[in-house]
Amino acid sequence: FPKTDYDVDIYADNYIGIYDNLDNSVVDYEYLDESNYPFYHVDSDTDVLSPYFNLNEKKPNIVIILVEGLGRAFTNKGAYLGNWTPFLDSLSTQSLYWKNFLSQGGRTFAVLPSILGSLPFAQSGYLGMGEKMPNQLSLLNLLKHNGYETSFYYGGDASFDNMELYLRRNKIDDLIDKDKFSTNSGLLPETNGFTWGYDDEALYAKYLNTRPSDSMAKPQLGVLLTVSSHNPFKINQQQEFYDRFEERMTQLDFTESKKQDYRAYRDQYASILYTDAMLKKFFENYEKRPDFSNTIFLITGDHRMPEIPMATVIDRYHVPLILYSPMLKRTSEMASISSHSDVPPSILRLLKSNYQLDLPEDTSWLGKGLDTVVNFRNIHQIPLIQTKVNMKDYVVGTYHLNGDRLYEILEDMGERPVNDPKQQKSIMDAYNGFKQKNAIITNGGKIIPDSVYIKYTN
């Protein structure tokens, strides 16, 4: 097993220590031409992930698993609804684990542009722009430019919410959705004649059976989006996971009264237990492949499942991020806040530091990169979009603006209302600045110069 962060050499140049008075001041960008390219800025070369890795000579495979509805409220130790993911909880102790992580959307439509492209929302989500999506750089096209083979696997219909269009525009090599599954085995049960598609077990099997594992293959970037834990939460092994639901409540020492309350959401919790069990099976099978030892896995939720009542506004976006790899030389649990948009810059900086990737010096990333400080803080400005017609949330430091209400985010990611007109005005000004930039994109503005796009996508 990798070492924990307590084994770290605190005198290493790139070690970020634990301090009593952490700085929550927000880091800003040096923009280059805001009127023409509102998000285009000088990129940072700060690589915070390399100190955790012993990487191999060959570029690593990257596997990103986006789990439908996986909220922190019921995931891992400390979850306020109880820990319903025993496998993920175990995996997180062998990983880099961000427990105070945020998705940037309240629904699935926001996840691909955020975690692959670190993009703004435009009017109703970046994907909502359809054919008018401006050219941009992403993990997909930048890694393809650097010799990677890219793929997307989804048990449902990838044309939903223009996901397929976005992926094609990012030059995806292989796109596998429900039309590419050759059997009905694994189809989720129909509800009123409708099924979302194939369950997690079938999705993971499809990935393992169709991705190359030999050492001569190109390095892989694989993105998987699950659907089993989506409303209406009907799964194929329904009774088995109803039984596991009852067993789990007993393991969690629930009183009979509390059990009765939770039974109102039996389908939801059963689907979470199923999701966790299928992830366990996926890793057990992947471990048998020769490429397992050279793979970096990222697991996160696309958003928090809203069908189980939420405790706060921020709860809708509170998801885990687990970064696991056999190449990790130490583990860490981070209480600092980061978001989906921080993933692309950090992954690319890790690879650039170790494999001299050909990447632009200037970028349009919304996120600054993952924060690896273990104590609670937030150095990011994080816009959030709950639905395609509801963009009113903005996080700056440990404050969360929700419309005309201001909340302080607490160390357990709870929040409390605060009355601080000066702070509220400051955050509102920052949010208005983001919305002005975002409106330029909505109205046909560009993300990056054409010359940069052409150089790094050919």
State where each predicted segment sits.
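Catalytic-site neighborhoods of secreted/periplasmic enzymes
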Residues: 112-195, 231-240, 246-248
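Active-site His/acidic residue clusters
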Residues: 180, 207-267, 306-308, 312-313, ...
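Non-catalytic, well-ordered alpha-helical segments in soluble enzyme domains
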Residues: 141-147, 335-372
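N-terminal secretory/membrane-targeting segments
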Residues: 1-60, 92-95
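His/Cys-centered metal/cofactor-coordination and adjacent catalytic loops
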Residues: 49-50, 57-60, 71-149
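Substrate-binding rim/cap in mid-to-C-terminal beta-strand-loop elements of soluble/periplasmic
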Residues: 109-119, 311-355
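Phosphate/adenylate-binding glycine loop and adjacent helical scaffold
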Residues: 359-458
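Metal-dependent active-site segment of extracytoplasmic phospho-/sulfohydrolases and closely related
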Residues: 270-314, 347-351
